[in-house]
Curated annotation (Swiss-Prot):
The keyword Nucleotidyltransferase applies. It comes from Thermoplasma volcanium (strain ATCC 51530 / DSM 4299 / JCM 9571 / NBRC 15438 / GSS1). GO terms for molecular function: DNA-directed RNA polymerase activity; metal ion binding; poly(A) binding. Pfam families: Toprim_4. This is DNA primase DnaG. PROSITE patterns: TOPRIM. GO terms for cellular component: cytoplasm; DNA-directed RNA polymerase complex; exosome (RNase complex); primosome complex.
Length: 444
């Protein structure tokens, strides 16, 4: 009962409190031995404190001057007894309010009944005000930030989109969407559509070009013969189809894919960097994904291109030592005896010999391992190089007709290899200082 009285009384009081005057709320608990009414309680408060505290703290004068608010009483009578609360709003300072509260406890009669008054508490009204201010300020601040962030993000997005649109160019006879660095880059990234190019431009990747569908344009075919090509495709069936088309009509060095079920145009910066960092050499990609028919067809097509040249090269390599055996004058006189190189030997200190060997290996799609004396100790297909080196780490130098990838460098370093010579340099993010890496297409 007392709790219900307290709640309802508090509600009434807060409705009547003048927020400009009230600093404290005195809550007095009332007990009487008999039945009394509200006017009896109010009369006792004024009557029994009159003259008790002097003229400066007289309740009637304080109420007239607005220092004390309207006294609210809530009581309930049961079984011949009355209990309840009286609440007195005070605009006095702390000391004066405390004196006034203590004076209320001197009341010993209310109406005709004996009574007891106890101060339950004196509440600082300003604390609640401050708490309400804090809560409201937080809400206002959050609303301001939300609107400010939205505006800021919208402005940044608008400016960025305009910059990206101004950077994208139309390249080749087919007017393909491309990044502004497509003309100057040794390596290019082939994507599916314009939105893919825009998304990569957003994160500063500018050597991109879009094929605009599965019908690969002549411009892309031509570029693939001149540049190191990474195809960066969606993680869906459409990406698979574009890759197959590229393999049939163009040259591909690396494959990067968006996560399954996602498109390049919707990738975040972190996803793009991860996909490009872990791009896979084309032969390894086809092998890992069970695309054996495509791998066979791609290999055969590239071998056919080099068949005649390869035969001439083999002939040149075979005939050259024979010519070196004896240098003969027109008269048939032998002027110099030259030793014949051992089979499988390569002069690793002679750049000309190394470059010719790399050219021959590129046509054979082969990787070779040499010891420190230049003697060949292993030979295997480029696609098997990483696995073979892991299984049997040996030798001093790798000579490969394929691309020098980050994975090959890591494996070679762990195997104790000191030199890697290859045809092209892939996307390298780190290179140990004590391993020598040379790509002939960039060093000659």
């Amino acid at each position: 009962m007392v709790m219900l009285i307290s709640l309802s009384l508090k509600k009434v009081i807060w409705m009547n409190v003048d927020p400009n005057l009230t600093k404290y709320m005195i809550k007095a608990k009332i007990y009487t031995d008999g039945v009394v009414e509200k006017p009896d309680v109010v009369g006792a408060i004024f009557g029994q404190t009159e003259g008790l505290l002097g003229d400066d703290l007289d309740l009637r004068d304080l109420q007239k001057s607005g220092k004390i608010g309207r006294i609210e009483v809530e009581i309930d009578s049961k079984k011949g007894r009355t209990e309840g609360y009286a609440l007195i709003p005070s605009g006095l300072d702390q000391v004066e309010t405390a004196i006034l509260a203590a004076a209320l406890e001197t009341i010993d009669r209310i109406g005709p009944c004996k009574a007891k008054v106890e101060i339950a508490n004196v509440e600082d009204v300003r604390v609640q005000k401050r708490q309400k201010i804090i809560e409201r300020a937080k809400k206002i601040y959050q609303d301001m930030n939300s609107k400010g962030d939205d505006l800021s993000e919208s402005l940044v997005k608008s400016v960025r989109e305009e910059v990206e649109k101004s950077e994208i160019i139309s390249y080749g006879e087919e007017k393909l969407p491309a990044g502004p660095a497509i003309n100057d880059s040794d390596s290019i990234i082939v994507v599916e559509g314009r939105n893919d190019v825009l998304n990569l431009l957003k994160y500063g990747i500018k050597n991109t070009i879009a094929v605009q569908g599965t019908n690969i344009p002549e411009t892309v075919k031509k570029l693939s013969k001149e540049r190191t090509v990474t195809v960066f495709l969606d993680g869906d069936r459409g990406g698979d189809l574009i890759l197959k088309e590229m393999l049939q009509v163009a040259e591909v060095d690396f494959v990067a894919r968006a996560p399954p079920g996602t498109e390049v145009e919707e990738l975040t910066y972190k996803q793009i960097v991860k996909a490009l960092r872990y791009k896979t050499p084309i032969d390894q990609y086809l092998s890992m994904h069970g695309m054996n028919d495509e791998l066979k067809e791609y290999s055969q097509r590239n071998n056919l291109v080099f068949t005649n040249h390869n035969s001439e090269q083999k002939k040149e390599v075979l005939e050259e030592p024979e010519a070196e055996k004896n240098e003969v004058l027109e008269q048939g006189e032998v002027t110099q005896q030259v030793s014949v190189p051992k089979e499988g030997y390569l002069d690793l200190l002679n750049p000309h010999d190394v470059s010719r060997r790399i050219e021959a290996l590129s046509q054979l799609k082969t990787t070779e391992i040499y010891d420190s004396n230049g003697q060949r100790i292993a030979s295997f297909p480029v696609a098997e190089a990483v696995d073979r080196i892991i299984q049997d780490p040996q030798g001093n130098t790798i000579v490969t007709g394929g691309i020098i990838s980050q994975r090959l460098i890591d494996v070679a370093y762990n195997a104790g290899i000191k030199n890697i010579y290859g045809l092209k340099l892939g996307h390298i993010t780190k290179k140990p200082v004590d391993i020598n890496v040379i790509a002939w297409d960039r060093s000659t």
